[in-house]
Each structure stands twice: as structure tokens, then as C-alpha cells.
UniProtKB/Swiss-Prot annotation:
Keywords: Heme, Hydrogen peroxide, Iron, Metal-binding, Oxidoreductase, Peroxidase
Native source organism of the sequence: Rhodopseudomonas palustris (strain HaA2)
CDD domains found in the cross-reference section: catalase_peroxidase_1 (cd00649), catalase_peroxidase_2 (cd08200)
Region spans: Disordered: 1-24
Organism classification: Bacteria, Pseudomonadati, Pseudomonadota, Alphaproteobacteria, Hyphomicrobiales
Gene expressing this chain: katG
Name the UniProt record assigns to this protein: Catalase-peroxidase
Family: Belongs to the peroxidase family. Peroxidase/catalase subfamily.
Post-translational modification: Formation of the three residue Trp-Tyr-Met cross-link is important for the catalase, but not the peroxidase activity of the enzyme.
Single GO term (MF): heme binding
Cofactor or coenzyme needed: heme b
Function: Bifunctional enzyme with both catalase and broad-spectrum peroxidase activity.
Length: 732
């Protein structure tokens, strides 16, 4: 209603003018379930078009030429943003680190995989101050090589080249990160101001899924917890935040010390003289932020944050000086020119170079979080070993850096380029390559018949297949049916996977696998991973046929079975869902979202659209996919048949819904005239009748002519989940 009418065109301008931007639906109804995240970063916002294959483009890239240009860039200091010590290495390492460092294990989101650092809010986080300059320095190279290298890959590659140009041998590099074209609206914290810290409860318990201590930081406050310069207390924050990025103590020490072997921090003057961040800047600033009125605003006068620290005597060369200085001096608290808390070496000579004046020397300085590596007992032990064994330090940093920058890429089949390391690493969730002939159509038909004749129900087969495949997270490409890791701890014991039923299904499928493979004479085999999925597909086909719909569920063999020694059980714990609306499950662990929010979150991790989510859930309900075999949301008199009954009966106006008087989060649907109990459902079920957008989708599937379309749409969504981790299919 704030929009003005354009008299000439006789319509309303979609942009707000005058008194405000106008109210959005979310302003009127802030508690309304937001399903828009299911449609972000769609092909409609991608300028490359549907036929663009980035992985193929990258493989045609002259990688040596790019690397040569990046090496030249490192020492080509620009007047508009001069390089510290005549070398951009430290700046570029920080850019790559901060691109990758947003990754968090809890939900797999963040990380370097999509080039999100160029979008809000990351491009304007306080911890990313002046990284806009690093990206602008890279623009001529990105412009030169065009679509053959993404921003996401270029950030990481630049970090690697920066390290190599300063004398460090990296572990390797993989390309293949395709750019996205709009910001990811992730939950970065509840705070409404930069550096707020309302994310803690109890004894400094950090809320899930967050991976940083304050809003706008990558990890921790370098001055200490909330600015308290206590290295031991800071170590607790470091350990927690780095663990949430999948790093153990050794990797953490190696990363901090390795990164701080290079470059400097920038606190040359009063931080209040820094201008707005990129997203808050003036139009004429063209996306550059943090314009400073202190001195020249750059070079020796640059202000990025508070501390003004240079860690080593050779900030553009790989060395062991970080540990030599850390243990070689005693440290006293000091303040930077910007007023930030930092530490200086007691009784030391000034042997640290100035970044711009070769005639000046500085005292050795450290951050509070650097001293944590000496004063935390566990970190101290590792740090002393690295001090005494520089080769171990170099190897640990190389491996940790590779893990940091590749953790969210998923399995090695997604890696591209000639610099990919040959070694398989446990955090890559390796799966053996296919080493046998795959089953053909006749074999598949025979195996389906064998599975359906095994005594396993439609519900059991569907539940096992969905449990195996639905661990997939599109965020970091982990999980999924390939590998059949559902037969290992911890997945086989998760409550959501119904361990007793699962064990029965796996036992019968393993027997079928053994019998089939033992009968072959031509080297043909079927994996258990394939059989689990095939069992679900066969059950869906049977359920559709029993409902009067003949439909074939696509199945592509080629999954392999991972070995237990290839599986880091602890790392898979984060894949266990607290809640899963598709299976009408709410776990015993603390919930951070409502059940319906958890459903949308799970759908987004599975890379589903709202229509796909709707069809999939409606089908799973009637097929008996609920955990514990509950009847909540099973709105049908024909269970284990693939009907559209869930939608028909949910939208039936003969039923009136009310909260259950005996069971929390359960609702009772009673006959409006007689009061007789007809159905029970959860919040997840009823949201498809309550939420206007989801109701519109439910209506499509509740119509009298909807059964064939529903069956097709369910099968399409089912197949998408079953194949979510089949990157080998995409590669072919």
C-alpha cells in the first residue's frame, strides 16, 4: 500500500517509494513458515543456463596459465590497495581461509563450495573486512579466464598459489565448485548486531548449528572470549568452533600456526574512522566497503579490525618462526593503535619487519588466541612437537589446509583437475570404485521378485531405502545411499532408522546378495547399497500397482559398499536428524526448530523443491514410512498402497481438527457431525492444510484426477533422493 500508482501505465510500481519499502508477508506474520529457501539458487537466477556444465568447463581450463598469472599477481602491488611487504600472499590466504571457514559440520552448510563470500552477509561480515579488495585484485584473472573457472574455485586456488609463492608445498587442489548466483539465507545466529553473542546458554554452551562465537566472525574473537585476554579461556572457544568445522586438536594447531606464519593484522588507528561495509556503502563505492578516513586509508594506515600483529620475522616466507617466537619469549599484555588487546614479547629486540618501511623494525607480537597454543595443555604438547619437528608441522598444515578448503566438496568423484591428490582421506568418506560388471535389466527384475518374495513388507523396504538415502546433505555432499553405511555404527543404531526393523531388512537383503553373487560366473555382482535402494523401488512399484497405477521406478546400479575402516563413525554422528518430518519423527535431543521448520530444513538439505517435498511426504505417509509405525498422518484406509489419500482426507471438510488432550504435538481429526475420531496427525501433517502455499500444492494432489500425477511426482521425488549422492552418474 506504500507503492505509488504509475498513472501512465495504469498499474502499480512494484518498488516502494516515499515513506518506506512497504510490508512483506513476513512483516505481517513473522511466525509464518518460510518455504522460500526451497526455491533459492534455482536455474531462474543462474545466468549460465541449464546446459552449462561447469565441471566440463573447468577440465578445459589451462590451469598452469592461471597459476602463472596468480603468481605474478602476488607481487604486483597496486596503488589503490598496496601489498603488505610487497606481497599479497597473506591477504589471499586469509581470503581463501575465510571462504572455506564458514563450514559447519552440524548441518554441512557454509564453506567454500559456492563462492558465497561475494554475497551478503559474508561479504560484509566484520571478520571479512577488506577481503573485498582481495576479490577486486582477482577480477582481471577471473575476467580473463571467464566461465572456465568459478569464483569459488578461484578463491581456493588463489590461497594455494599464495602459499606456494611463499615457499610452502601444498597437499593439492581440486576444482569443481560451481558458483551460485544469489545469497544463501542461512541462520548465522540470533543477534541483530555485528559481534553480538546471544548464542550461548548454560556454561557457555554454543547453540547448534552455529560454528562461531559472535555474529560476523568466522571462528573466535582474537582478543579472547568477549574481549577477555585469557588464552586458556580462548582455547575452549577455539576447540569448540574448530571441532564444529571437523578439525581435531592437531589440525587446529597446524591451521592457526600455519596461517599466522604469513602476513599481518591491521589495526593502525581508530576503528571508528572506518566507513560502511560493502552492502551498506554508497552507490558510487561500487561494492567496496570499509573506506577509512585514517591517514591514507590504506597501506601503512590500513584498518581491518583492532589488533596490529605481525607474527614472524619473514611474513612472506614459510618458516617455523611462529613456534620459535611463541615459545622463545614471555608475553605481556599490550594494546594496538586501535585500542585492541594483544601481546608483545618481553625483553625482545625489534626484529619484525615493517610492511612498508624497510628501515623500521617492530617487536614480536601475538594474539590472545595465538597464546592459547602454548597455554592450553593439549595444544601446548602439539605445538612443542611442531616446534621440534618442522617437517611434521609442514605436513600437518598441508593436510589441514586441504581439508579446510575441500571439506564441503563431497566425495572425490566430484574433484576435477590434475592437482587432485591420489591419496584417499578418511574425511572424504571414501567408497571403493566399481570393480565388477553391473546387473542388467533381467537381473534387476529377478532381484525385485526375490526381494518382494522375501517376506519383507512394503513399509519395511521403503523405510530402509529412505533411511539409507535420506542422510544425504546437499550442503556438503555427505551421506546418501552409496556405500551402504547404514549397516555400520552409528547409523544402524539411530532411533529414526528403527534398528530392529532395519536389522531384519539388512539380514534378508544380505542373504539375497550372497545368493545372487555366488551364482554368477561372469564376474557380475550386486552391492548391498544397490539392493537397499532396489528394495525400496520394488516396494514403491508394488504399492503403486496395488493402488491401480502401473509405474516403473527408475533404478541405476553402480553403488558400492564402503568398508568399516573407510568410515569415521564419529564424523557421521552429525548426520543423525534431531527430527525428520518425512518420517514423522521427533527425537529426544533438544529441538532448535519447530517440527514443520525441521521438515523444510530437511527438504532443503535433500535439495527438494516444495512440490517435491509435498509429494514425497504424502506418499511416505500412506506407504507406512513413519518411525515406530505410528498412524499419525496415515490418512488412508488402504495402507501400503501408493494413493493420494493423504491429501484427500487432510483437506476433507467433514473433518474438524483440534489439539490432542493427551499427546503433545498431536492433533485429532474428528467427524464434524458425530465427533467420532477419524485421524490423528502431527504439526508436520497439518501444515499442508494450514499453510496457504502448501495447501495449494496439497490441493493439486487431492483432486479427483490427481492419482496418476501424484504417483509420477512421488516417484520422481523418490528417485531424486535415492540418486542424490550418485555423482558418478552426473560425471558420466
Amino acid at each position: 500500500m506504500d507503492a505509488k500508482t504509475d498513472d501512465k501505465d495504469g498499474g502499480k510500481c512494484p518498488f516502494p517509494h516515499g515513506g518506506g519499502r512497504g510490508r512483506r508477508n513476513s512483516d505481517w506474520w513473522p511466525e509464518h513458515l518460510d518455504i522460500s529457501l526451497l526455491h533459492r539458487n534455482s536455474t531462474l537466477s543462474d545466468p549460465m543456463g541449464k546446459g552449462f556444465d561447469y565441471a566440463r568447463e573447468f577440465e578445459s581450463l589451462d590451469l598452469d596459465a592461471v597459476i602463472k598469472d596468480l603468481h605474478a599477481l602476488m607481487t604486483d602491488s597496486q596503488d589503490w590497495w598496496p601489498a603488505d611487504f610487497g606481497h599479497y600472499g597473506g591477504l589471499m590466504v586469509r581470503m581463501a581461509w575465510h571462504s572455506a571457514g564458514t563450514y559447519r559440520t552440524t548441518d554441512g552448510r557454509g564453506g567454500a563450495g559456492a563462492g558465497q563470500q561475494r554475497f551478503a552477509p559474508l561479504n560484509s561480515w566484520p571478520d571479512n573486512a577488506n577481503l573485498d579488495k582481495a576479490r577486486r585484485l582477482l577480477w582481471p584473472i577471473k575476467q580473463k579466464y571467464g566461465n572456465k573457472i568459478s569464483w569459488a574455485d578461484l578463491y581456493v586456488l588463489t590461497g594455494n598459489v599464495a602459499l606456494e609463492s611463499m615457499g610452502f608445498k601444498t597437499f593439492g587442489f581440486a576444482g569443481g565448485r560451481a558458483d551460485t548466483w544469489e545469497p544463501e539465507e542461512l541462520f548465522w545466529g540470533p543477534e541483530g548486531s555485528w559481534l553480538g553473542d546471544e548464542r550461548y546458554s548454560g556454561e557457555r554452551e554454543l547453540s547448534d548449528p552455529l560454528g562461531a562465537v559472535q555474529m560476523g566472525l568466522i571462528y573466535v574473537n582474537p582478543e579472547g572470549p568477549n574481549g577477555n585476554p585469557d588464552p586458556v579461556a580462548a582455547a575452549k572457544d577455539i576447540r569448540e568452533t574448530f571441532a564444529r568445522m571437523a578439525m581435531n586438536d592437531e589440525e587446529t594447531v597446524a591451521l592457526i600456526a600455519g596461517g599466522h606464519t604469513f602476513g599481518k593484522t591491521h589495526g593502525a588507528g581508530d576503528p571508528s574512522l572506518i566507513g560502511a561495509e560493502p552492502e551498506g556503502g554508497a552507490l558510487e563505492d561500487q561494492g567496496l566497503g570499509w573506506k577509512s578516513s585514517f591517514g591514507t586509508g590504506f597501506g601503512a594506515d590500513a584498518i581491518t579490525g583492532g589488533p596490529e600483529v605481525i607474527w614472524t620475522q619473514t611474513p612472506t616466507q614459510w618458516s617455523n618462526h611462529f613456534f620459535e617466537n611463541l615459545f622463545g619469549f614471555e608475553w605481556e599484555l599490550d594494546k594496538s593503535p586501535a585500542g585492541a588487546k594483544q601481546w608483545k614479547a618481553k625483553g625482545a629486540e625489534a626484529n619484525i619487519p615493517d610492511p612498508f618501511d624497510p628501515t623500521k623494525k617492530r617487536l614480536p607480537t601475538m594474539l590472545t588466541t595465538d597464546l592459547s597454543l602454548r597455554f592450553d595443555p593439549a595444544y601446548e604438547k602439539i605445538s612443542r612437537r611442531f616446534l621440534e619437528n618442522p617437517d611434521q608441522f609442514a605436513d600437518a598444515f598441508a593436510r589441514a589446509w586441504f581439508k579446510l578448503t575441500h571439506r564441503d566438496m563431497g566425495p572425490k568423484v566430484r574433484y576435477r583437475g590434475k592437482l587432485v591428490p591420489k591419496e584417499d582421506l578418511i574425511w572424504q568418506d571414501p567408497i571403493p570404485p566399481v570393480d565388477h560388471e553391473l546387473v542388467g535389466d533381467k537381473d534387476i527384475a529377478a532381484l525385485k521378485a526375490k526381494i518382494l518374495g522375501s517376506g519383507l513388507s512394503v513399509s519395511q523396504l521403503v523405510s530402509a531405502a529412505f533411511a539409507s538415502a535420506s542422510t544425504y546433505r546437499h550442503s556438503d555432499k555427505r551421506g546418501g545411499a552409496n556405500g551402504a553405511r547404514i549397516r555400520f555404527a552409528p547409523q544402524k543404531d539411530w532411533e529414526v532408522n528403527q534398528p530392529s526393523d532395519l536389522a531384519q531388512v539388512l539380514s534378508k537383503l544380505e542373504a539375497i546378495q550372497k545368493e545372487f553373487n555366488g551364482a554368477q560366473t561372469d564376474g557380475k555382482k550386486v552391492s548391498l547399497a544397490d539392493l537397499i535402494v532396489l528394495g525400496g523401488c520394488a516396494a514403491v512399484e508394488k504399492a503403486a500397482k496395488d493402488a491401480g497405477t502401473d509405474i516403473q521406478v527408475p533404478f541405476t546400479p553402480g553403488r558400492m559398499d564402503a568398508l568399516e575402516e573407510q568410515t569415521d563413525a564419529d564424523s557421521f554422528k552429525v548426520l543423525e536428524p534431531r527430527a525428520d518430518g518425512f518420517r514423522n519423527f521427533i527425537g529426544k535431543r533438544k529441538q532448535y526448530m519447530s517440527p514443520e521448520e525441521s521438515l523444510v530444513d530437511r527438504a532443503q538439505l535433500l535439495n527438494l523443491t516444495a512440490p517435491e517435498m509435498t509429494a514425497l511426504l504424502g506418499g511416505l505417509r500412506v506407504l507406512g514410512g513413519n518411525v515406530g509405525h505410528t498412524t499419525h498422518g496415515v490418512f488412508t484406509e488402504r495402507p501400503e498402497k501408493l494413493t493420494n489419500d493423504f491429501f484427500v482426507n487432510l483437506l476433507d471438510m467433514k473433518t474438524a481438527w483440534s489439539p490432542s488432550a493427551t499427546t503433545e504435538v498431536v492433533y485429532e481429526g474428528r467427524d464434524r457431525k458425530t465427533g467420532e475420531l477419524r485421524w490423528t496427525g502431527t504439526r508436520v501433517d497439518l501444515i499442508f492444510g494450514s499453510h496457504s502455499q502448501l495447501r495449494a500444492l496439497a490441493e493439486v494432489y487431492a483432486q479427483s484426477d490427481a492419482q496418476p500425477k501424484f504417483a509420477r511426482d512421488f516417484v520422481a521425488a523418490w528417485t531424486k533422493v535415492m540418486n542424490a549422492d550418485r555423482f558418478d552418474i552426473v560425471a558420466k
